[in-house]
Amino acid sequence: MKFFVDSANCEDIQELQNLGLVDGVTTNPSLILQSGRNILDVIQEICSLVEGPVSAEVAATDFDTMMKEAAVLAKIANNICIKLPITLDGLKACKALSEQELKTNLTLCFSATQALLAAKAGATFVSPFIGRIDDCGTNGIDLLHEIRTIYDNYGFATQILAASIRTTTHVKEAALSGADVATVPPKVLKSLAAHPLTDKGLQTFLTDWAKTGQKIA
């Protein structure tokens, strides 16, 4: 499973990139707001930091304006992935952009039927929002399993990009479901490496090593 960083903070992205953990980046209007920067500037910088897909979201809701905004975003870099909402206009724009061989990410997916339409529209990625589904009292991970089954049944090439990831358990369950990608906030991504038994075991080894009086380098 690939890891995308769900952030518009270039310092966080660079830190994770240096660790070799970044396969791509996703942004959205809320993350752009948090960055306090111009969208074109921040997306351009992110694209210079990572080689993988960088999702940049249109702000329009009608087809014509979506296409105009997509054209502006696509010019930023070759690794831009145009992010669109799963609406009828968004699906239409996705189909048109796919025919131009541009990468697309259909977002705000909350049902398997929406994911089916995303695949039919030729989306590169579909983004089911796991955490937000959990907030409604339904298991968001179940949606990942449903989409995986549908896509496998029909051989769709659209990749499942698990989004709205809140916890390390979400990441684990997304991996078990067969999701192709998980887009993860920096804090959660870094916490995947943490375990109290690892810390305890390392401390024991370091204490014993100190007693040997040896050096390796």
Curated annotation (Swiss-Prot):
- Where found, per UniProt? Cytoplasm
Q: Which superkingdom?
A: Bacteria
What's the chief localization of this chain? cytoplasm
**Which residues pair up as cystines?**
none
Give the enzyme's main class according to its UniProt record, as a single word: transferase
Task: Tell me the keywords, alphabetical order.
Answer: Cytoplasm, Pentose shunt, Schiff base, Transferase
- Biological process (GO) annotations? carbohydrate metabolic process; pentose-phosphate shunt
GO cellular-component term (any): cytoplasm
Catalytic activity field: D-sedoheptulose 7-phosphate + D-glyceraldehyde 3-phosphate = D-erythrose 4-phosphate + beta-D-fructose 6-phosphate
The EC number on file is 2.2.1.2
Entry's transmembrane regions? none
Q: Which residues form the active site?
A: 83
Q: What are the protein's GO molecular function terms?
A: aldehyde-lyase activity; transaldolase activity
Q: Which Pfam families match?
A: TAL_FSA (PF00923)
Name the pathway. Answer: Carbohydrate degradation; pentose phosphate pathway; D-glyceraldehyde 3-phosphate and beta-D-fructose 6-phosphate from D-ribose 5-phosphate and D-xylulose 5-phosphate (non-oxidative stage): step 2/3
Would you identify the family this protein belongs to, as annotated? Belongs to the transaldolase family. Type 3B subfamily.
Q: What does this protein do?
A: Transaldolase is important for the balance of metabolites in the pentose-phosphate pathway.
Q: Which HAMAP family match?
A: Transaldolase_3b
Query: This protein is called what?
Result: Probable transaldolase
Lineage here is:
Bacteria, Pseudomonadati, Pseudomonadota, Alphaproteobacteria, Hyphomicrobiales
